[in-house]
Amino acid sequence: MENFKGLQKSLYIWTDSADLDKRVEQLKAATGGDVALENVHRLSFSSYANSSFDLIVIECAQLTDSYVKLLHMLKPSGKLHLVSFIGPAASLLQEIKLSGFINCREDSPDALTAEKPGYETGSSARLSFAKKNANAVNVWKISGDDEELIDEEELLDEEDKQKPDPAGLRVCSTTGKRKACKNCSCGLAEELETEKQSQKATENAKSSCGNCYLGDAFRCSTCPYLGMPAFKPGEKVQLADNLLKSDI
């Protein structure tokens, strides 16, 4: 009991009333404070407020369901002392630990002591972490002023803006170029020959009346440019394929 000197308020839980007054006086002398009494069989019906006692002493008792209740009844850093307990010390120590007590120890073959943590059950505390680096936080901030926008017009050259000539898109499946191979079977040779004949006929086409470029209203019935839009004098015009073939 020497370790309990200076504790102001204690609770003595008893089972045998024999020499009860003597044991209470010994506890008062050891603590120097007030001592309240409670029978072990009436403990579950008691209505003690939380954090009421600095020390709870139990003699000749084995409590299996009341250790949590005793934990609430003790003040923060309060002590629980079991004397002449019933049962193996190892089992009691494990049960007390699982109820929330700390620093559980066996003082002697017939005495155990445990403590309540230095804070109230259900209390909270502010965690003190290192201060955040303001520069580290700003790394993840996106500012519109810092964005470098790319001019869409700079992505394309003048050559990219020009539409490709559909006539020059098809290539030979063998050579990969717009030039027919020797044994062409994909039809590119015939297509190139037709374009060649069309170009030659266009170059040889001449106007007998001199009014072909003005449009159909000024063209004769056999004009090779019949049905085509008007064009400038001297402008190179490609005739349609059906005008290069015989009607017979």
Swiss-Prot record:
A motif (Cx2C motif 2) lies at residues 220-223. Residues 4-129 are annotated as: N-terminal SAM-like domain. It comes from the Eukaryota. Residues 130-161 are annotated as: Linker. It is found in: Cytoplasm; Mitochondrion intermembrane space. A motif (Cx2C motif 1) lies at residues 209-212. Residues 172-186 are annotated as: Fe-S binding site A. Keywords: 2Fe-2S, 4Fe-4S, Cytoplasm, Iron, Iron-sulfur, Metal-binding, Mitochondrion. This is Anamorsin homolog. It comes from Drosophila simulans (Fruit fly). The gene is CIAPIN1.
